[in-house]
Regions:
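Alpha-helical transmembrane segments of multi-pass membrane proteins
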Residues: 2-261
Length: 261
């Protein structure tokens, strides 16, 4: 009897991807609602906002706000690359070591984003227009989203996407699902297309669900509505560290057996 293939979507790599998509949807909608339509994970939208403002002849902080977000994002990317070069000899003890470290950093960043954001919201710092005083909050949010996108890009799901939801994801999902109907290819290729299409569909569902739930909660709790996302992130982080530890233990047991022989 032929064994059925294990469900691809239950691997820890996919769990991280879907959790990051859900959390990313929540953070994006909060930034859109409270940070003057700044989508801190989508640089193209900020670039368009900035260009449109400049085209209308406005050259104040408001016009620089969205362009500044793009510039800060590029600086974060540059710093990350410099760190990669500096610590090129860093050896990951397991395949999940880097993910666990990145997720842990993001726990602190998200907690800081929530607390500082709620303080600014209740104290009146977040007024009707953006001011330089909100820059620290923007930087924290951008750092969080950069790591989130990095986790999705390098999360090991073998599907070509760099963020939770970009235009490419919609195209890849649709073409993969439609390709399943192509009987000119083998059954295994059709199944692979179906799995890929369902993966992208799950990414979109998780992102949309996170954004919808957070948008509903935000009218009552403000930035505190992201505590749901923080709890999920902590759970995913702990699970990743546990997986890392189990892998280490199994590796050490194998080494002990080899030495005993």
């Amino acid at each position: 009897m032929k064994k059925s293939a294990p469900c691809t979507f239950t691997s820890i790599n996919h769990q991280i991807h879907y959790a990051m998509s859900f959390i990313g949807g929540g953070v994006e909608v909060i930034s859109f609602i409270f940070l003057f339509k700044a989508l801190i994970g989508f640089m193209t939208s900020n670039l368009i906002f900035g260009i449109n403002t400049f085209a209308n002849g406005k050259f104040d902080y408001i016009s620089l706000y969205h362009i500044g977000i793009v510039v800060i994002w590029m600086l974060i990317a540059a710093i990350h690359q410099l760190c990669m070069i500096k610590f090129t000899n860093f050896r990951k003890r397991t395949p999940w070591h880097g993910y666990a470290i990145s997720l842990t950093i993001n726990c602190f960043l998200l907690a800081s984003f929530i607390l500082i954001g709620q303080y600014m919201l209740t104290s009146g710092v977040l007024g009707s227009l953006p001011t330089p005083s909100i820059t620290p909050l923007i930087i924290i949010g951008l750092m969080f989203m950069y790591i989130q996108n990095y986790l999705i890009k390098s999360g090991g799901t073998n599907y070509p996407t760099t963020t939770s939801v970009v235009t490419t994801v919609y195209v890849l999902m649709t073409t993969s699902l439609v390709n399943y109907l192509n009987h000119n290819i083998s059954k295994s290729e059709r199944q692979a297309s179906l799995r890929e299409g369902l993966h992208y569909l799950l990414v979109l569902i998780h992102f949309s669900a996170g954004a919808y739930i957070t948008a509903k909660l935000s009218s009552h709790f403000g930035f505190y509505s992201l505590f749901l996302m923080l709890f999920i992130l902590i759970a995913v982080t702990m699970n990743t560290w546990f997986t890392h530890s189990r892998f280490l233990c199994s590796s050490s047991d194998e080494n002990s057996n080899d030495k005993a022989i």
